[in-house]
Amino acid sequence: MTDNNHEHKQPLPSLAIAAIGVVFGDIGTSPLYSLKEAFSPSHGIPLTDQSILGVISLLFWAIVIVVGVKYVLFVMRADNNGEGGVLALMALALRSLDEKSKMAGLLMMLGIFGACMFYGDAVITPAISVISAVEGLEIAAPHLSHLVLPLTIVILILLFWIQRHGTAMVGRLFGPIMVLWFVVLAALGLWHILQSPSVIRALNPCYAYTFMAAHVLQAYVVLGSVVLVLTGAEALYADMGHFGAKPIRMAWYVLVMPSLVLNYFGQGALLMHDPKAIENPFFLLAPDWALLPLVVLSTIATVIASQAVISGAYSLTSQAIQLGYVPRMKILHTSELAIGQIYVPVVNWMLLFIILCIVIAFKSSDNLAAAYGIAVTATMVITTILACVVMVKVWNWNKLLVALIIGVFMTVDLGFFGANLLKVEEGGWLPLGIGALLFFLLMTWYKGRMIVKERTAADGIPLMPFLQGLLAHPPHRVSGTAIYLTGSDSLVPVSLLHNLKHNKVLHERTIFLTFVTRDIPYVNDADRVTVKDIDGGLYLVKAAYGFNETPDVKAVLLEVGRTHDMTFELMDTSFFLARETVVPTQLPGMSVWRERVFAWMHQNAAKPTDFFSIPANRVVELGTKIEI
């Protein structure tokens, strides 16, 4: 069986460097565009010293409160057996509730919507990150500015094309490269802070308050740009399972946060000295001789940031499939050593297509910035709500204390979310639309699967009495092994009924195999497989997997063989599957048009042979019709 190598056995500094290469790519490349967008001409904020100090103060305290306090100190405590992310947090919160209660239903919908918002963010991050880095050419080599869009498209196509080959080899370089990136951020910022040290006054939150009070409406609009410094904050929590909380906290406090703060303050110092630098305050931090190297390093950093988002989309899809919210898809493992490195072709090519359309339509990072942020803030609000449930129901914290903590976080989150709602018309509709469409599809799939399960249970035959009757009056037994994959270990598989009806035989060794997904990321190997010997060569096998794992039929059979002294020859084994055809009807459940959508999704789901890695030439599929 597969070892659960998700445990973190490397030295803390090594894990921290690795985390810097994966976890902090998105938030680490935010200085490329955040401050520039905050002073967008459309906001009408004058480039005075007081305004610059006010905006820098807002950026600083947003980073401290949302990332440094909310995520690093509180949310990262709410791990699901070491795993983070909105679906893992949802599973943890649901564990303490009655699954049939309205509260559980609401939390499930919130968690799924949060996951859908991640996809809305995942199509913006690579687009805005790469294009903002390549836009450095407009400063470093103005005569090449016409190449910004074509270069961005080429880089993105190459990035998605290499996914199928895995990124294990180049992944080892991500950490050191991003460490260099953060050191460069810090050095550029510190250089300008030393030239204009008065910018340090922005550490005082009074400047943020004064700015908000003086400009009110414009300042609230600016909050929609300030949130750009927080994009990627959710990754600290979502990637916790890969590295552990300690390395991520260490990387944040020792290198990432100081570097970001120094760079933002350095950009502020530059603007106070030369307001015209608002054209591109990040690249104008660098001396002329360093511009082209900085463009190259920025492009590499944004590719790494995009890679983290793409890998996150694969992982989230895999989790959602195991939890039953997404149809089966073909999942390929790109590394024999790291079980978490996977590739989902459908997700990969859909992301690339949408991202290229976005780049061609929006054309610049300035235009894309309007679309960025709303998905991030929506996920932040959902994370806060789910964390509140965990604090009260799982940790049993004092409700007054929870109200105080969550009240502060929710005020900040809703403030940012409200400010981003103002950008819906300019581009915020894009991630919202993607998220809403995915939410509809995921809820349709989940509801449809529940209806199919109910119809199957209503028409099903209890398994144990049936098998006892079968053993009492056995049909003709044939040599070999038959394995029936079934979704319920208490009902007779439809494929068995059809086999007995048409072929009138039963194999010498017959195994009923059921896969179940637990609400934890990983299942210990010792608890993976349970086998019940019914007698007469009949066995009930239940294989348990976590939502971060991919079921493996061959591995299960090896475990059964090891514990029950059996051998399995694949060429002497037949796998019997029921191919369900879903037929929309007027029966109670969903509206007919949603049932048709579900039937289409069901028809296009990956075949069980692909998903469970079963040799196609050993499979017997028997059709069955289910009316919903």
UniProtKB/Swiss-Prot annotation:
Provide the reaction this enzyme catalyses.
K(+)(in) + H(+)(in) = K(+)(out) + H(+)(out)
Protein purpose: Transport of potassium into the cell. Likely operates as a K(+):H(+) symporter.
Q: What is its main location?
A: membrane
Recorded protein name is Probable potassium transport system protein Kup
> What GO terms fall under cellular component here?
plasma membrane
Highest lineage ranks of the organism? Answer: Bacteria, Pseudomonadati, Pseudomonadota, Betaproteobacteria, Burkholderiales
Task: Specify the superkingdom.
Answer: Bacteria
Q: Which family does it belong to?
A: Belongs to the HAK/KUP transporter (TC 2.A.72) family.
Q: How does it sit in the membrane?
A: Multi-pass membrane protein
In which organism is this protein found? Paraburkholderia xenovorans (strain LB400)
- What Pfam families does the record tag this protein with? K_trans, K_trans_C
Give the InterPro entries listed for this entry.
Answer: K+_transporter, K_trans_C, K_trans_N, Kup
Q: Where are the transmembrane segments?
A: 15-35, 55-75, 104-124, 142-162, 173-193, 210-230, 252-272, 281-301, 342-362, 372-392, 400-420, 426-446
Localisation per UniProt entry: Cell inner membrane
Q: List UniProt keywords, sorted A-Z.
A: Cell inner membrane, Cell membrane, Ion transport, Membrane, Potassium, Potassium transport, Symport, Transmembrane, Transmembrane helix, Transport
A GO term for molecular function = potassium ion transmembrane transporter activity
